[in-house]
Every structure is written in C-alpha cells, then in structure tokens.
C-alpha cells in the first residue's frame, strides 16, 4: 500500500462508446467527491485507471495499447470496462496490471483505488464537484444512460457476455438525473443504452414514480416526461420493436427531436437470420414510409455490416436496393470483423477481406450520393442549430438531424457573436455529402 501524504492524483483514460463515457463520468465523480485529484498526465499520478472497450478487435487492440502506455509511464494501473470481462486476455499481455474489473463495477474500482492510494483525510474538492457530477462532454450536452446490458443475442456481438442482460434504471432516477443536467445548463440530452427501446422490459414496465407522480417504466413514457424539460432530447440505439411507432407522434409534435438512431445491420432476410436480427425488410420499409408521413422532418440514422459470414453478392445487392428505397439520412457501415466469443465466428463461408473492402466502398459511394441529395433538399430552408464551437473564423454547430461525434455539422462562417450551447435559427446556403453551411437569420 502506498504511503500518500500529498493530495492523491489519479490519471484516467476513457475509451469506447458513449455508454462507456457515462461509466467513466460516474467513477470520476466519485473520485472527485472523495477528494482525489484527476490529472491528464500519467507521470505525476499516483495511479492510472483505464476504462476499456472490447467490442471489436480494433477496440481491444486500442485498449491493450492504452494499458501498456499507462504501465510504461506510471506502473500502477487498474483496468475496468468491457475488456475487463476478459481478465485472462489482459493478464496475458500485461501481467503487471494491479487489478481488473468488468464493466459498470464502480464500487470495485473505488475499493481498489482506496487500497493502493488511500483517501485523503481532508477533501478540498467536495465543494467543487457539480451537482450533476463530473462530465466529459461539453457543458451544453450530456449522455443519459437509461439501462445496462441487453437481452438480444446477435451473433456478431458479445456485449451481453460483458455487460449482462438488460437492467433498466428506475424511471424516477433517470428523470432526476435529467433534471439535474438541465439545471446545470445542458441544452441537449442524448438518451443511450445497449437497447433503448427495451427500456422497462425487464421489470415488465412496472409503475415508477418521479416527484410523487406515477408513470410507466417504458421508452414512450420516458420520452413524454423528458419532453417537459424544455431541451433537445435525442434517442440512440433504438432496436426496431413495434412500439417504436409510438414515439414518432411525439417527434411530430416537437416533444422530442425528430431523430431516430435505429441499427438495422442488413437487408437480406437470410443474413439477418444468421445475425439473429429482425428479418422483414418489406415491413421495415413500410414502417419508414409511415414514420415519414407522420413526421416529415424525421431524420433516420442506421448502421450496417457488410461482409458478414455467408454474405453473397445477391445478399449485398439486396442491401444496396434497400438503401436506394429507404433513402436514410445518416448511415454508418462496418466491415465485418470477427470478435472473440461471438457466435458468427462459427459460421461457414467467411468473406475474404478484399471482397469486404470492395463492398464497403460500393456501399459508401451509394450512401454518399443519397446523403448529398437529402442534404441538398435543405438548401434555402431555415433550421435550428445548436452551437458547439466558436473561434475567430466563425461557429460550428449541429442541426436537429446531427448527433455529436457521429453525424455532420453546420458551419456558420464569420458568425462569432454566439457561444457554445446557443440555439440559433440558420438559413442553409450550401451542402455537401455530410455537412451544411449557412448564415444566422
């Protein structure tokens, strides 16, 4: 055990998705509350915590490299997060790691920190910890995690083996956190989980309470309540359950942002079956048409995988045909990558890397054309934009159709009389495949 006499300092690195970022924020909030100083450099820290990602092989490699860097520069390292669920894999590469915990093991992480770097007796930081906790996002937006884990067993994914089955947070707790965020100046709440539309399924949508008011534990009920906070609410990771239809009217009424992040993964019924995903493409196209009729402003984001084991040229052509018909606004595409422990590894007919690359290029070329056409439709229109950055050359923001980090931006060249978090009306003057340019009205 270290004999720490100065103010203890903890180095911290957070890797992976927004869900992991929320876990990091929770750990950092506890550390700050207990009086630890969190520092950006490893060399003068008493210990380093690495919150890892283990979703795909490249993420595993990045996590292992970050652990190695922390060991080289500091020597005392605790590992947590998704890759922490595979302790043997970490120990094989980095046997000198002090402790390893799995994802959302907040208490264990803190116990290990206390063991190696005891808590300070005097806490000069307690009054500096904001009520909403430590946030790693800009002040004007924040991620709101509503559940942990997932009940699906998609064959390309190992999240359930790392994070377990679905566990929904009590709706009262979620809404209390959202209220604290808004009170602290947050203008945009990004609702996240492994499976947002499954919120409440594990507790059979039981009645919860917030400020003494009863409400159902469900995605639709949660959206209704969040809409009362008067800020932008954006839904991510929405599995295409039938009840997703029920949130579209809320978007049409302006209660939550007309934005749906709904990972569809493929469009060939045969490949979807191999993935253990919903397989009715015609039904999905009909739903998209219906959603747009109800809410013409709706932005649809999705992600797809090309080169999944067994994918033929015919299967891939079905995917391209789907893109042409669905005309989705925002699309991400991944080349299938084997993940240790995933069921898809056992499937026959693995697709050669050069074929994956060729299909990915064709996919992206088509979707870029669709995206450019969709954005061109906005030229000449007025839209609302939330400002993210301002410098001497102007401002950069996002429209209601743009989530942070993953979507496009709106450039306001020469506009310096705004600040991050401002929501301004903008006339769109130009567009390319991903971004817009405009002037404040």
Curated annotation (Swiss-Prot):
SUPFAM superfamilies in alphabetical order: Radical SAM enzymes
Keyword Transferase appears in the UniProt entry: yes
Cofactor note: Binds 2 [4Fe-4S] clusters. One cluster is coordinated with 3 cysteines and an exchangeable S-adenosyl-L-methionine.
EC number(s) from the headed UniProt entry: 2.8.4.4
CDD domains in the record: Radical_SAM
Recorded catalytic activity of this chain's protein: L-aspartate(89)-[ribosomal protein uS12]-hydrogen + (sulfur carrier)-SH + AH2 + 2 S-adenosyl-L-methionine = 3-methylsulfanyl-L-aspartate(89)-[ribosomal protein uS12]-hydrogen + (sulfur carrier)-H + 5'-deoxyadenosine + L-methionine + A + S-adenosyl-L-homocysteine + 2 H(+)
Localization annotation: Cytoplasm
GO biological process, one term: tRNA modification
GO cellular component, one term: cytosol
Location of the MTTase N-terminal domain: 8-118
Keyword annotations: 4Fe-4S, Cytoplasm, Iron, Iron-sulfur, Metal-binding, S-adenosyl-L-methionine, Transferase
An example molecular function term from Gene Ontology annotations: aspartic acid methylthiotransferase activity
Annotated TRAM domain residues: 376-441
SMART domains (UniProt xref): Elp3 (SM00729)
Gene3D superfamilies reported for this sequence: Methylthiotransferase, N-terminal domain, Nucleic acid-binding proteins, tm_1862 like domain
Record Pfam families: Radical_SAM, TRAM_2, UPF0004
Top-level taxonomic group: Bacteria
Annotated residues for binding of [4Fe-4S] cluster 2: 150, 154, 157
Residues holding [4Fe-4S] cluster 1: 17, 53, 82
Segments forming domain Radical SAM core: 136-373
Cofactor dependence: [4Fe-4S] cluster
HAMAP family membership: MTTase_RimO
Similarity field: Belongs to the methylthiotransferase family. RimO subfamily.
Record function comment: Catalyzes the methylthiolation of an aspartic acid residue of ribosomal protein uS12.
Protein name: Ribosomal protein uS12 methylthiotransferase RimO
